[in-house]
């Protein structure tokens, strides 16, 4: 199915009146089968509000892509939640912990070399209690600078570095309160970095979604929602229950083992046997 590119002048009123649209939208979770549509440019699973970084994006998605409808949140019958990866990454973007490369590098190097904590600075690695707290919730994991860095590393291994960085850049742009001049420059930077035909870190993006982004850029300077659908598309690739999977990954387990080993050494007075 080919999708005609609609002018934002036609799209935006529909988005503004999304509340009316939402009331008239009746979708059964089990009734959606994306594969039945003739547009085979991309294969997507059944979508729901949990798959989106902002629930408002579901409205945009459904308006722009009616042949790939996503079920929206029903406050009367469903608990408000979204994918673990999106919860964590959103908090990471807000805390600006995405560039803590030094932290994650030190952790990775220490874990790989199995150097005992007695030989490491107390600031090199997180404490045992901090690592244990990561198990409790995605929010506590995201609240730790070490947890942020390590989870991002894990997610990049699960998907790709470019996709994770694109998602984070989009989120920072969306949340920014900077002047319109900066936002306009940032829009073009993201396009040039990830979406243009000659982008050095080009990510796979459906043509129709890219066309929407370009129309937004052309008609509205620095619009905060420019990349919403593109960001949502990339977010769909992140694994579900990623918090649980992270806690089962060697990246986390090796670090936990190392910290426990270091605690044991410290308790026995740094015996040589450690």
Curated annotation (Swiss-Prot):
Pfam families registered for this protein in UniProt: RGS
Any one biological process term the GO annotation gives: negative regulation of signal transduction
RGS domain mapped to chain residues: 137-256
PROSITE patterns: RGS
Keyword set includes Cell membrane: no
Keywords recorded for this protein, A-Z: Signal transduction inhibitor
CDD domains: RGS
Superkingdom, taxonomy of origin: Eukaryota
Residues passing through the membrane, by range: none
Keyword Membrane applies: no
Annotated InterPro entries: RGS (IPR016137), RGS_sf (IPR036305), RGS_subdomain_2 (IPR044926)
UniProt protein name: Regulator of G-protein signaling rgs-11
Organism from which the protein derives: Caenorhabditis elegans
Lineage: Eukaryota, Metazoa, Ecdysozoa, Nematoda, Chromadorea
């Amino acid at each position: 199915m080919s999708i005609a590119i609609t002018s934002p002048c036609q799209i935006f009123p529909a988005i503004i009146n999304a509340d009316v649209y939402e009331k008239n939208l009746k979708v059964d979770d089990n009734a959606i089968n994306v594969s039945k549509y003739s547009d085979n440019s991309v294969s997507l699973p059944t979508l729901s509000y949990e798959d989106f970084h902002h629930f408002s994006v579901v409205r945009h998605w459904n308006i722009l892509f009616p042949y790939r409808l996503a079920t929206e949140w029903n406050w009367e019958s469903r608990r408000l939640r979204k994918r673990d990866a999106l919860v964590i990454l959103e908090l990471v973007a807000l805390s600006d912990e995405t560039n803590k490369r030094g932290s994650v590098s030190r952790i990775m190097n220490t874990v790989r070399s199995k150097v005992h904590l007695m030989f490491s600075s107390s600031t090199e690695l997180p404490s045992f209690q901090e690592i244990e707290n990561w198990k409790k919730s995605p929010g506590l994991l995201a609240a730790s600078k070490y947890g942020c860095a390590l989870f991002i590393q894990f997610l990049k291994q699960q998907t790709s570095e470019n996709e994770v960085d694109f998602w984070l850049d989009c989120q920072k742009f969306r949340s920014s309160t900077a002047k319109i001049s900066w936002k306009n420059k940032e829009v073009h930077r993201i396009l040039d970095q990830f979406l243009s035909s000659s982008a050095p870190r080009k990510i796979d993006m459906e043509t129709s979604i890219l066309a929407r982004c370009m129309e937004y850029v052309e008609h509205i300077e620095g619009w905060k929602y420019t990349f919403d659908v593109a960001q949502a598309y990339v977010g769909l690739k992140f694994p579900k229950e990623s918090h649980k999977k992270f806690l089962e990954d060697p990246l986390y387990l090796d670090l936990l083992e190392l910290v426990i080993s270091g605690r044991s050494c410290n308790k026995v007075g740094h015996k040589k046997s450690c």
